[in-house]
Amino acid sequence: MQHNLIAFLSDVGSADEAHALCKGVMYGVAPAATIVDITHDVAPFDVREGALFLADVPHSFPAHTVICAYVYPETGTATHTIAVRNEKGQLLVGPNNGLLSFALDASPAVECHEVLSPDVMNQPVTPTWYGKDIVAACAAHLAAGTDLAAVGPRIDPKQIVRLPYASASEVEGGIRGEVVRIDRAFGNVWTNIPTHLIGSMLQDGERLEVKIEALSDTVLELPFCKTFGEVDEGQPLLYLNSRGRLALGLNQSNFIEKWPVVPGDSITVSPRVPDSNLGPVLG
């Protein structure tokens, strides 16, 4: 299979030329490739955020994709770049620091190699920019038809560094989860609470209690809605995001500006106390 589509993620930002130079290296190796930007605005050095941004990429991109990703605070050290084939047939290239964790949860690794061959690197390799000279260059060589086995020695997929992912769980009277991501563009809060765990509570218009421990155990009483327009402008709601997880938002406004939670904060969702006459904020 010819992998002539490259999906590219990094933490270098879009304010200067860094991501364009990486693309220049890739086009120099694979001029027929198409390069799609996932994002270059991962928070600097934030491997977990980068991993979360990659989580849905395997589902959304076709099998002939090379997923090229780097958030590489260890650049120039013994942390190696790896190249992986997943069950879907896609190829992934990135540092072995956990960045590929959630993408590989979506489509597990079936073959993995350390990228050690100088033939698939941009020479001379800059120790402070493995992302360009090793990750991007290797991804381009794979897109140009280089065999995966040619990049370096095969390793057991069990050697791929994986980030821990806290699962939501049932607790007395409700479901306990945590904030995993902030939708920066709109200020919505995404949790790790999946549909199957909370489905019995999710009746359209049903009001649920949401306890946010980091905000002095603030409790919100929020309606569950299928979409934002079911509440008035500026009003809070619960909804299922496009990834099938429970999320909190404000219609046409910014949830975290009003309730400033961050990833890792605990959230407990439970059925509304019957006959409660309290407003949206209970505590």
Swiss-Prot record:
Catalytic activity: chloride + S-adenosyl-L-methionine = 5'-chloro-5'-deoxyadenosine + L-methionine
Effect of residue 131 to S: Loss of chlorinase activity
Pfam families xrefs: SAM_HAT_C (PF20257), SAM_HAT_N (PF01887)
Effect of residue 70 to T: Results in a 2-fold reduction of chlorinase activity
Binding site for chloride: 131
Residues annotated as binding substrate: 11, 70-72, 128-131
EC annotation from Swiss-Prot or TrEMBL: 2.5.1.94
Organism lineage string: Bacteria, Bacillati, Actinomycetota, Actinomycetes, Micromonosporales
Assigned protein family: Belongs to the SAM hydrolase / SAM-dependent halogenase family.
Organism listed in the record: Salinispora tropica (strain ATCC BAA-916 / DSM 44818 / JCM 13857 / NBRC 105044 / CNB-440)
Knockout mutant characteristics: Cells lacking this gene are not able to produce salinosporamide A (SalA), however they produce salinosporamide B.
Protein's name according to its UniProt entry: Adenosyl-chloride synthase
Disulfide bonding pattern of the chain: none
Function: Involved in the biosynthesis of the proteosome inhibitor salinosporamide A (SalA). Catalyzes the halogenation of S-adenosyl-L-methionine (SAM) with chloride to generate 5'-chloro-5'-deoxyadenosine (5'-CIDA) and L-methionine. It can also use bromide and iodide, producing halogenated 5'-deoxyadenosine (5'-XDA) and L-methionine, however no halogenase activity is detected in the presence of fluoride.
Key words of the record: Chloride, S-adenosyl-L-methionine, Transferase
Record bears the keyword Transferase: yes
Effect of residue 129 to F: It has a reduced activity, however, to a much lesser extent than the Y70T mutant
